[in-house]
Amino acid sequence: MGSKGLKGVMVCLLILGLVLEQVQVEGKSCCKSTLGRNCYNLCRARGAQKLCANVCRCKLTSGLSCPKDFPKLVLESNSDEPDTMEYCNLGCRSSLCDYIVNAAADDEEMKLYVEQCGDACVNFCNADAGLTSLDA
């Protein structure tokens, strides 16, 4: 990899680091029952997450799954997770990968950059940012 390519990868990693720092974690609530889930959803119309979780006997989590005794997973009402993932991937690829591709010296290097940058964007948008790497 030439110095141009290395500079491009470094810039990408720096930008991803800045984006990661600004990502807001979307809260998820886990409730023991459908009744608890409905209680939480109604409460959230006016109440704070922590208050509603306590009143309705739910737990707040930032993970992808709920504890076994809290099986009902609820995304916040303003969440549209599949669209969010799609737009995250699209934005990441268009802003970061385009820059890196322009730094490629030849077609072979460009294909490698496109693949690695695309994989990094997928990992980032699926919350696997700790696993994201552009190294071959």
UniProtKB/Swiss-Prot annotation:
Could you state a single Gene Ontology molecular function term? toxin activity
Question: Is Secreted given among the entry's keywords?
Answer: yes
One GO term describing the cellular component:
extracellular region
From the Swiss-Prot or TrEMBL record, state where the protein is found.
Secreted
Is Cell cycle a UniProt keyword of this protein? no
Q: Which UniProt keywords apply?
A: Disulfide bond, Plant defense, Secreted, Signal, Toxin
Family of the protein in this entry: Belongs to the plant thionin (TC 1.C.44) family. 4 C-C subfamily.
| Protein name per the record | Purothionin A-1
**Where does this protein come from, organism-wise?**
Triticum aestivum
